[in-house]
């Protein structure tokens, strides 16, 4: 979850809003260098082992995509446009209010992913984490998930990783 690396640990108070702009800029610049270095290493490894059945792809994961759409400094709008990665992964909890939010997030990440790597599919945005706390959901989880999955399939999302088959949150 790249935004937590960029911002610091998650908690109820939004400390990111209090971080000075020059510090945010420096964090983004360093994050960009790190991700580009990782991709370069993966590219070199792929080049050195050409005849393997194993395919290795590098993804950058964003987890605060919806605020990135609104212009808040985030991985999606301040790092992703400046790196080359094979895939973009979205830990998509912030886009689960509706299939429309999921679509907005996927479109935003697709637009920001300008320097594509070696992933062979047209759609390079994957869902790296998705799920609900069933015990506290005040809606039909199965119905919501179906509408979101349908939207992801419609948009040719290559991978969707459901985080919790059994609810791992305390009651």
Q: At which residue positions do the language-model features occur?
A:
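Buried hydrophobic core signal strongest for RNase H-like alpha/beta domains in large
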Residues: 3-5, 52-66, 76-79, 88, ...
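Well-ordered, non-membrane alpha-helical segments in soluble/globular domains
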Residues: 20-45, 70-78, 99-113, 140-151
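Substrate-binding cleft of secreted/luminal carbohydrate-active enzymes
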Residues: 92-97, 121-171
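Generic structural signal marking isolated hydrophobic packing positions
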Residues: 1-2, 160
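Substrate-binding cleft and catalytic face of glycoside hydrolase catalytic domains
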Residues: 2-27, 49-54
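Glycoside hydrolase catalytic-domain groove-lining segments
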Residues: 70-138
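Aromatic-lined carbohydrate-recognition surfaces of secreted/lumenal glycan-active proteins
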Residues: 25-73, 90, 120-133, 159-165
């Amino acid at each position: 979850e790249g935004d937590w690396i960029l911002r610091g640990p998650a908690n109820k108070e939004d400390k990111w809003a209090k971080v000075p702009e020059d510090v945010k800029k420096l964090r983004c610049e360093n994050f960009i260098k790190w991700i580009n270095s990782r991709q370069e290493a993966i590219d070199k490894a792929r080049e050195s082992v050409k005849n393997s059945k194993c395919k290795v792809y590098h993804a950058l994961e964003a987890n605060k995509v919806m605020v990135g759409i609104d212009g808040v400094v985030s991985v999606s709008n301040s790092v992703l446009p400046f790196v080359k990665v094979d895939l973009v992964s979205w830990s998509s909890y912030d886009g689960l209010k509706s299939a429309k939010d999921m679509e907005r997030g996927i479109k935003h990440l697709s637009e920001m992913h300008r320097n594509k790597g070696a992933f062979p599919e047209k759609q390079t945005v994957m869902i790296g984490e998705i799920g609900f706390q069933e015990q506290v959901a005040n809606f039909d989880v199965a119905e919501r998930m179906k509408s979101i999955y349908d939207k992801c399939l419609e948009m040719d999302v290559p991978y969707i990783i459901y985080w919790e088959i059994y609810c791992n949150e305390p009651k």
